[in-house]
Amino acid sequence: KTQVFLTPKGDHYRTRLSHTLEVSQNARTIAKALRLNEDLVEAIALGHDIGHTPFGHAGEFVLNGLCENGFRHNEQSVRIVEKLEKDGKGLNLTWEVRDGILNHQSRLMPHTLEGKIVRFSDKIAYINHDIDDAIRALVLTEDDIPLELRKTLGFSTKQRLNTLIHNIIMNSREKDDIMMSPEIEEA
């Protein structure tokens, strides 16, 4: 996953695996609080980035130029789980899992609430940990983050994570949708 830091030193920078596990953990937390299908969000979360290329976004950029219809990791993720795994037989995943994987990052929204949870959880994870990785790499400090943003989302990685997850839970309770408040989503 390390998109910004190509040669990280130490063991605190995120990888594709740690990102996927963070997405899964955040998604399960939200699903549990909303009494939705935790196993479904976990299956979607664990498969959502399986189609990413080596070398991060640079690899995806190169493949995008080589492929006739472009390259999108979410579409490749679905190809992997439907066709490439198990010697070409696929993993026999439900439509809901495949829909969540495909639409976690596209112009279309997932058709299930669980898929929408993973879509938000993915954004929460990559935004929060890109900031955290930049702070650990001394590229920026917490004080470099605009004060208004820190007041809204929190003054640390943990506070931002809690704010974002709590906001989704509170704004999605007893609704037929998964959403953030406009103030938090805009931040």
List each language-model region with its residue ranges.
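Short active-site segment of divalent metal-dependent hydrolases/proteases
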Residues: G51-F55, A125
